[in-house]
Amino acid sequence: MNFWWLKFDDASTESLRNNIFTNNSITKNMRLNADTILNAQSYINPIGDRELNLRGLQIPVIENLGVTEDHYTSLDLSDNEIRVMGGFPRLETLRTLLLSKNRITQINDVKNIAKLETLVLTQNGIATLGALESLKSLVNLTAITLDGNPVQHVPRYRSYMISILPSLRMLDFQRVTQKERDEAEAMEFDVVPVTETDNLSAVDKAELRERLKNATTIQEIEEIEAMLKV
C-alpha cells in the first residue's frame, strides 16, 4: 500500500482531479441520484485504482450507489455536505473511500463496505469516540486519517482507534507501532456508541421521512430506513 496517496489534497493531485473534472456536466446542489452517479467522471488514479469522482457537488447524503454495480475500487466524495457516513449498498470491490472536507459527525452502516482498506476523513466534525464505534466492522482497514476532526483531541483517541481496528497500520499519517498495539490491548474503554439519529436535526429527520414516503425502489427504502434507524 502506497500510503503517500492518502495525502491526496496536495497541489499535484488536486490539479489532476480538477483537470479531469473540468468537463463534467453534473449540476451542483443536487441529490446523489442515479443520473449524477452515471454521468460522473471515472478514471484510473495514480496508484492504478479505478476511481469514481463525486467530489465538490454539495451532496448532502450518500445514497443510490448501487447503480455503480460495485465497479470501482476507489470512491471520491470529498468536499461535499455529507453529515453521516452511511447508506452504502454492498460494495465488495471498494478499497479506498475519500470523504475529506464534509460535515460528517457520525459513522454508521459500514458493514457493506467491509473490504475497505483506506479511509480518509480529514476536516470533518467527528467529536467523540462513540461516533467512531461503527468502524469496528472495517476489519480490513489498514490506513485511516481523521486529521482536522475534534476527536483527535479526546484522551486516548489514538489508542482507541488501534484497539477497534486491529489491522490498522497507519493512523493520521503516522505508522502504528507494536508498542502502541500492546498498550491499546491492555486498555479498557468506556465508550457509548452514538446512533445516527442522535446527530440528525428535526428538520433532517422530517426530510428523510418525506423521502421515505416518496421512495420508489426497495434499495432507496432500505437506505432511508437505515438512516432513520426504523
Curated annotation (Swiss-Prot):
GO MF term list: U2 snRNA binding
One GO term (biological process): mRNA splicing, via spliceosome
Keyword flag Repeat: yes
Domain spans labelled LRRCT: 149-187
LRR repeat feature ranges: 15-36, 48-69, 71-92, 93-114, 115-136
Alphabetized UniProt keyword annotations: Leucine-rich repeat, mRNA processing, mRNA splicing, Nucleus, Repeat, Spliceosome
GO CC annotation terms, alphabetical: post-mRNA release spliceosomal complex; U2 snRNP
Family matches, as InterPro entries: Leu-rich_rpt, LRR_dom_sf, RU2A
Subcellular location as annotated: Nucleus
Family from the record: Belongs to the U2 small nuclear ribonucleoprotein A family.
Role description: Involved in pre-mRNA splicing.
PANTHER family in alphabetical order: U2 SMALL NUCLEAR RIBONUCLEOPROTEIN A
SUBUNIT field: Associated with the spliceosome.
Name by which UniProt lists this protein: U2 small nuclear ribonucleoprotein A'
